[in-house]
Structure formats: structure tokens, C-alpha cells
């Protein structure tokens, strides 16, 4: 069945993948890329999903720029029902990389008084059982590319050792994104990529601009964030300068414009 998305999808593919930096070894022909895009869009219609297939295509475009001989896995933090995981597994199969999935498979963690988004009512939201996630990937993705590491980020992420080509964070809470950055950023390869679906939570975006956080944790300047939070006014808020919740520098937040 043809509709408006079917007409515009080829334009999206052209816009994202008309790129001389895509490595020729991937044999990323127009038809292969178009087939990939349709599959990702279909998966988004079949599985309950928290992020857009367009974002997944943008990740594919960046992975295709990394030479295939460059070491590095893809990491996803927060997979919900496995919709984004299925799409990432398809992309990983396209580029020949493995996908490591971190999730509690119990939904969101306990409330955090330092985080206005982490209220008691949020506990358990976005829960996807591990077996349900695996079943969705087996049906719509490439399960052979996936490994699953179950548990809270504070327990599992410190054990991560693999080089990372691309990481995708969809974690909702400030403590969670803090755990992801502290434990995964040191493993990101040179010219690797970090994507986040939490760009609508400007409190979470702010950490990418926090001079104090990046100097303390990594002895470097903050990388910033392309997209939401890049200094363009968004509603009532803009990112930076920073203040802290409860005097805790781990949780910088934006200042009202």
C-alpha cells in the first residue's frame, strides 16, 4: 500500500545517504539502502517503539562512514519492547557489527528526588520483558547480532570493556544518563558516535555542555550536542549556563531563558 511516507521515504534515503564519506566496502547501493529504510519503517509500525526509524537511519548513515576494519560494537541503553533494538540489529547486520543491549527489563528505576522526571509514578514505566524483546527481534530483526546484559545501569555498565563505534541512549533519567556517560564514553572509539533519544529532556541535554562534569570525569571540554540543546531557544528553556539540583554537580540543569 502506497501512501505519503512511501513517497517521501526515497527522498529521506537520498538526503541521509548521499554522502561521499560512506565506505565503499559496504556496497551500500541505492536499492539496498531503500530496502533497509522500508524495513526499519515497517518495524516501527509492528513493534511498540519509543524512537523514530528516521533516527535509526541517521545512525546507519554514520556507521556506514566508519571503515569496516575499525573495531567497535554498537551499544543500546534502554530498549523498551525491542523496536529500536530490532532496527539496530538490522543495521548492525548491514555493517557487520555486533549489538550489545543494556536494560533492566523491569522498566524505569526508583524515584530520584534530584530529578524532576524521576517521580514515584514513573517507576516501572517502559518495561519490556527480556523474552518479549527477544521474540520481537527474532521476528523483525537479526537476533544473532545481539547480546543482552540485564540489570540496572549502575551495576552492568561498569563491566563494559568493548570498544564502541556507536552508542544509543534512551534512558529518561539523569542518574541513568550519568551512568551511561561515565562508563561508556571512555570506550567510544575516535570518531565514534553517541546518539540520545532524550533530547526533549533538556535537563539531560545539559550534561553535554557541563564544563564541570566533563573536566571532572574525563579531563576534557564538553562535546556539546548536535540538535536539541545546541543553543537554540526551545520553548521556555535553553541549555546553559548551568546550575545544580541540590548542590550535586552530577545533575546540571538548564536556566530559564
Sequence positions of predicted segments:
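S-adenosylmethionine/decaboxylated-SAM
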Residues: 30-50, 61, 68-257
